[in-house]
Regions:
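Non-catalytic, solvent-exposed segments at the cell envelope interface
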Residues: 2-12, 20-364
Length: 364
């Protein structure tokens, strides 16, 4: 299998906090086919509303959210230190929440996945077949301006996702940059991750400082993550989930590690009672402008709606893929038939039956 040629920075992101569940729900309602709503950063979240019953109890915020839900979790590489750098969706995770809002399926798409990206008038993009990460960058352009709009990029990305997956509407989405995830993990006091293979960092020294870039590569001592359950602080969690070089399956191993990180964040959030909005508020506020969510719902509404979605009820799914090229040149990635089959099954609502017939897709 040819490894994806991608660079990482998250999330998301994962969006990787791009987490929707157990109160760290930062995906906010919007329609993928509609106009982008005004962006909201975590520091400007809606006023906190108590969910404690009163003498005349009103419906809890988020009580009207109904399943099933399809949420987009995006980790963005902004490279703000580089002039004219355009945002790239370096991590793309999709979370399908069942109708009862008590179980879900988490899966990743390669950022180099080759797809048809629709035309987008706001940025002047005429459409074409590209790596899906380019939907974020091409959509972010503002004609006549040097500025970039992450929110526009998100809108075009979700349109491309809808076209590829057949999922007509994504009810929520969130964008988190590299620094935001670092802050999130540290706000939680670190996370416990089960490291499934030895991983050497390309970017960090054992003390967390950056390795020296020389001649197009990094030199110096490397941080190393040994198999086993390890307590990781923010920079370690991000660094571990960032690595793809030297791994047997390259980016596909990295995608699995990122999903594992999301599960670890959810597990830690559960132990800290972050389904309680009063405890969730400081965590979200600490992310500041690192977190952007789009639309009219707040993280606190999703925190209530998904209060029963615990980590053990989230099935992580591995979608195998392979590189595609032309004339010896690399063009991107494509999912293998069984991976595409799962995507189609999600859109049709028969994913449980599909996984029963393809049990190897379920991460162990």
């Amino acid at each position: 299998m040819r490894n994806s040629k991608i660079t990482w920075s998250i999330v998301a992101g994962v969006a990787l906090a791009l987490i929707a569940g157990v109160g760290v729900a930062i995906a906010v309602s919007r329609r993928s086919s509609g106009p982008a709503a005004a962006p909201v950063t975590s520091s400007s979240a809606a006023p906190l509303v108590s969910i404690t019953p009163s003498a005349s109890p009103a419906p809890s915020p988020g009580a009207d959210i109904k399943g099933p839900l399809d949420l987009v979790l995006i980790g963005v590489d902004t490279r703000v230190s580089i002039p004219d750098w355009e945002p790239h969706a370096d991590t793309i995770m999709l979370l399908h929440v069942e109708a009862d809002l008590k179980s879900a399926y988490l899966y990743s798409l390669p950022r180099d996945l080759r797809v048809d990206i629709p035309a987008y008038r706001k940025s002047g993009f005429g459409g074409g077949k590209h790596k899906i990460t380019e939907a974020m960058s091409r959509g972010s352009r503002i004609p006549g301006s040097d500025k970039k709009s992450v929110e526009q990029g998100y809108e075009l990305l979700t349109r491309a996702l809808s076209a590829y997956t057949g999922i007509k509407t994504f009810q929520g989405g969130a964008i988190l940059n590299f620094g935001g995830l670092d802050k999130l993990v540290d706000q939680l006091g670190g996370i416990d991750m089960k490291i499934d293979q030895k991983v050497k960092s390309r970017h960090r020294k054992p003390d967390g400082s950056m390795r020296t870039l020389s001649g197009g590569d990094y030199i110096g001592p490397q941080a190393t993550y040994q198999p086993g359950v390890r307590r990781l602080v923010g920079w370690q969690a991000i660094d571990y989930a960032r690595q793809r070089y030297g791994l047997p399956n390259g980016d596909y191993d990295r995608q699995r590690h990122q999903r594992q990180m999301v599960e670890a964040i959810l597990a830690k959030a559960l132990t800290q009672g972050l389904s309680d909005p009063t405890r969730l508020r400081p965590v979200i506020d600490a992310l500041g402008t690192s977190l952007v969510y789009v639309g009219g719902r707040t993280p606190f509404e999703y925190a209530y709606a998904l209060r029963d979605l615990t980590p053990d009820k989230i099935t992580t799914v591995d979608l195998p893929g392979e590189g595609v090229g032309s004339g010896g040149g690399y063009l991107g990635e494509q999912l293998k038939d069984e991976g595409r089959g799962f995507i189609k099954a999600i859109a049709k609502g028969n994913h449980r039956q599909y996984l029963a017939g393809h049990p190897k897709l379920v991460d162990k």
